[in-house]
Amino acid sequence: MQVQKSFKDKKTSGTLYLVPTPIGNLQDMTFRAVATLKEVDFICAEDTRNTGLLLKHFDIATKQISFHEHNSYEKIPDLIDLLISGRSLAQVSDAGMPSISDPGHDLVKAAIDSDIAVVALPGASAGITALIASGLAPQPHVFYGFLPRKAGQQKAFFEDKHHYTETQMFCESPYRIKDTLTNMLACYGDRQVVLVRELTKLFEEYQRGSISEILSYLEETPLKGECLLIVAGAQVDSEIELTADVDLVSLVQKEIQAGAKPNQAIKTIAKAYQVNRQELYQQFHDL
């Protein structure tokens, strides 16, 4: 067990700060984020050119270290050594929260394993920002990040998730969005979705409707800009209707194959299909 007192413990090691950056509007940069980036010894940036423009705008002279998904494995030991020596680092992504669909998690884990304080600053996050204005249920929700690009893998992903009752969020390219929605329609049915593009920018847009309605709209209005896709969770109208043609035990076995423990898998499927957990437990163990 580890207990971190972020601002009270005086250690000889430095601190790793996770600093969010604007997702499109520079006015969303917080005072605390600017102050932190000025005070740390180094800034670990996903793209030093992109971050360089941000630093110039806010008159921040702190030196950058390139840190992205292609060099993180070799960079992390050196960054941990800097932290252990007493240097403080800030980690930023190109936009939004570090570690969310961006590099950072492995560095955080390595810092924690080395008993180095990790402090996250609040700020811009595309997923939460889009969700609360979407009109779909904000909780429970799950954010999956970027979808598989290959059609077969994407369809398998949707088949595995179509029964989830949570609101689901995905990142997607404007060049793939129509194919993605077509695959989703085949697996999820024509449920409600919200397509969000150019979040916080001048041309911010929310497209709200059924999957088929959004597809029809996109045929007439080509999409530009990176987008977020928010999908309503599966609706449970009747336990009998929902489970009549579903092999719940097989779904439990799939959850276990994916790494879940048996009891957790049973709980997940029972909740998703609104069936009695004890009855499903008995069915599973009677096999």
UniProtKB/Swiss-Prot annotation:
InterPro entries on file: 4pyrrol_Mease, 4pyrrol_Methylase_sf, 4pyrrole_Mease_sub1, 4pyrrole_Mease_sub2, rRNA_ssu_MeTfrase_I, SAM_MeTrfase_RsmI_CS
CDD domains to which the protein is assigned, alphabetical: RsmI
Gene Ontology molecular-function annotations: rRNA (cytosine-2'-O-)-methyltransferase activity
Major localization listed first in the record, in broad terms: cytoplasm
Signal sequence coordinates: none
Function per UniProt: Catalyzes the 2'-O-methylation of the ribose of cytidine 1402 (C1402) in 16S rRNA.
Protein name: Ribosomal RNA small subunit methyltransferase I
